[in-house]
Amino acid sequence: MLGETTMAIQEKGSVRALALVGPTSAGKTALMEALLHVTGAADRRGEVGDTSPEAKARGHSVELNLAGFDFMGDRYVVVDCPGSLEFCAELDAALPAVDLAVVVAEPDPAKAVLLQPTLRELERLGVPHALFINKMDQARGSLQGLLEALAPVSSAPLVARQIPTWDGDKVSGFIDLALERCFVYRPGRPSEQVDIPGDLADAEAQARFHMLEQIADFDDALLEQLLTDVTPSRDAVFADLVREMNEGLIAPVFFGSAQNGFGVRRLLKALRHETPPPARAAARLAISQGAYVLKTAYAGQSGKLAYARVFGAALADGAEFVLADGQRRRAGGLFSVQGAALKKIAQAPVGDICAIGKVEEALAGQVLSTSGEPQSVTAAARPRRPLFAVALVARNRNDDVRLSGALSKLVEEDPGLFLTHDAEARQVLLAGQGEGHVRLALERLKRRYGVEIDTREPKTPYRETLRQAVTQRARHKKQSGGHGQFADVTIEARPLPRGSGFVFVSKIVGGAVPRQWIPAVEDGVRDGLARGLSGYPVTDVEVTLLDGQTHSVDSSEMAFRTAGRLAIEEAMKAAGTILLEPIEKLVVYSPSPAASNVTSALTARRGQILGLGPREDWRGWERIEAYLPQSERQDLIAELRGLTQGLGAFEADFDHMSELHGRLAEDVGRLAREGA
């Protein structure tokens, strides 16, 4: 076996953290359950993973699942991560804090591209990672063909650590290229070591030499040995494999079947020797001592819990934390986490992920410092942007107050959700990473808080502007005994270029309108522009106050404000208005084979393609720029993901307003008037 010098030595008493990542249905949860079952942490499969009603209903993970196990005297905690892009905001704070990520994939070359978003994020964060090709008992093609399909999606070379052995057309075991040993799968028990079959000796030698060539690219001494036909020592080979994976220079590849337990023990042994200690993750995050929060959740009677990884020193219940803003709080309970089960503990060792109670200010991605000074992490996640939104209306109006509090908790738990109040549309909007993500939040809202919701489409912020310039006079006169009301104004209103907004100019001379009442005229004009002929705010207009009349007794600020409003309302009727719709600039990311379908979908939504080219540093992907009406974006993400195997994404920013013509303009105006 290996010498101590070839191991990633475990810090005494510390716990190493593994993330299981990869696309939906690759078998991440099955692998976690296999790890727990093989190590005796679970009596049977299904005890820990995906226990929430929402996950069970969907048949895949929708949130982080945490569980721990012991293997050969070492402690590990596993973070089982959702695979769908709709739920991947859960990973933003978690991934930077783990020691190693196991990327779970299927043995299907056609699905290789599904790994690319995960691999790119791990590479960006600098998190060491290995691949586990799951479901190899179902594989029919060659491992080499699969590796060739996977190679373009990884920036780091993929280094096969094993080659399969076959019984007919089924994988029956593997040869470990580093150990140079052969193992045969045995259902329900550990694999059995056997001699390397004679007909595979040449294939094993070639595969091992290729592995050595790959790691020699980063070790001149090993390269010299290969060039001079010197056989490197096993310890030297393992030392290179450990170092190069930990530095992100290579990504080792293992395979097996989580469902049958094949290859799981061998994976565990490799992880035991090669997973870096917690100190590396702490250094990557620049944390000296404290608890880094992966996620928060409200857990019934337990209140708010912060799920956090311990760095620097063991964490005791009741420990005092210094928050990022300098506030001090004490842990109000410390719990070990095994799936949905929480168990109160007195202390959590370095590297462990535990649940901490009653730190209400804690948020994902923050550090609860125990060093006495505030700390903040250096590997902050990139902020998510909403891709789909609905307007919310409580089915029972008595639930409005409860709804507000419940939504705040959901958004706090899930960094991919956004809650906004659109004052103009008078709508409460819940936005997320896709329709499924938002629907999940609404299900949780009902299950946890008993609040039922009706949803509407968010209103599009249309605008109007004048069709032509016009001069308009308006007089406000009212006599009802005593002081009356009188104001007379003449204005010129004309359209301005897009994006100019509202401009007010006074050309009053000689006191036709007293100076102190000119601002009232402007206020009145603004009042009138709040609602145009089609029911939308009017913009890109210049209004010039040309003349007016006043009365020494009956004129007032309110009278001139009313006259200003009447003048612009009559001006709009005389000039007519045109309807403007908001146009967004989209940047869409798509795998290259789907790019033509994506551009067609955008065009069908009245989009204007501005450019198409390769996505930087993403081999086999395209970057598409387009203008798209905001009203056409509502369900775009669903269509986009349907065209791209669930991988497509976009960024949208307001760009300009553009005239809406014909039947569409008529329909929008009619709906606005009907809803008035």
Predicted regions and their residues:
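Structural and coupling elements of P-loop NTPases
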Residues: 2-676
